[in-house]
A protein has these predicted regions:
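Targeting-peptide/extracellular-domain and disordered-appendage signature
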Residues: 1-168
Length: 171
């Protein structure tokens, strides 16, 4: 059953469960990481952007899924014979230390490794997305700098409950 969230609500209740499953077209569910039960091992946070047109697209992700961090850059070409390439270096056990902002409406998200760096800056009415990754395609690096200065009228906010059966692969 699909249910649209149309007013600001807390994302999680005091027990750490979703207050309402569904979707919103704006950032209406309010996230409070202190309500995630089970400590740092239960945090699953990421910041993802896709920017594209009819010719190409770029996707960038910084993720902290407790046991595994992921910094990803994808380039998609839609001209001629379509192709895509994705490089996703992983970081072991970041356990929340990536320091993602509590909201996607403002703040800085950053992560780097020996051969890459990603930085997402949100504030002053714009989003600046930068990425550098060595050996991206044919031993050449990729450098990305995208400035978004108009917020879309709608975005996608999805609130999906996960099965909490103890002793199962998905808790």
């Amino acid at each position: 059953m699909q249910r649209e969230i149309i007013k600001a609500i807390p994302l999680l209740n005091e027990q750490g469960n979703l207050t309402q499953a569904g979707y919103a077209k704006k950032l209406l569910p309010v996230y409070d990481r202190t309500k995630v039960k089970g400590g740092a091992a239960r945090l699953k946070e990421w910041d993802y952007y896709y920017v594209g047109n009819d010719r190409f697209g770029v996707a960038m992700t910084i993720a902290d899924n407790s046991y595994m961090g992921l910094d990803s850059v994808s380039f998609l070409s839609f001209e001629g014979e379509p192709w895509q390439i994705t490089k996703s270096p992983m970081r072991p056990f970041p356990m929340g230390r990536t320091g993602l902002p509590a909201t996607s409406a403002a703040g800085v998200t950053a992560s780097s490794g020996k051969h890459h760096a990603l930085l997402f800056q949100v504030g002053e009415g714009k989003r600046v997305l930068t990425a550098h990754m060595e050996n991206f395609r044919d031993a050449q690096p990729i450098d990305v700098r995208i400035t978004l200065d108009r917020e879309p009228e709608e975005s996608m906010v999805i609130c999906t409950p996960f099965d909490r059966q103890i002793g199962r692969a998905h808790v």
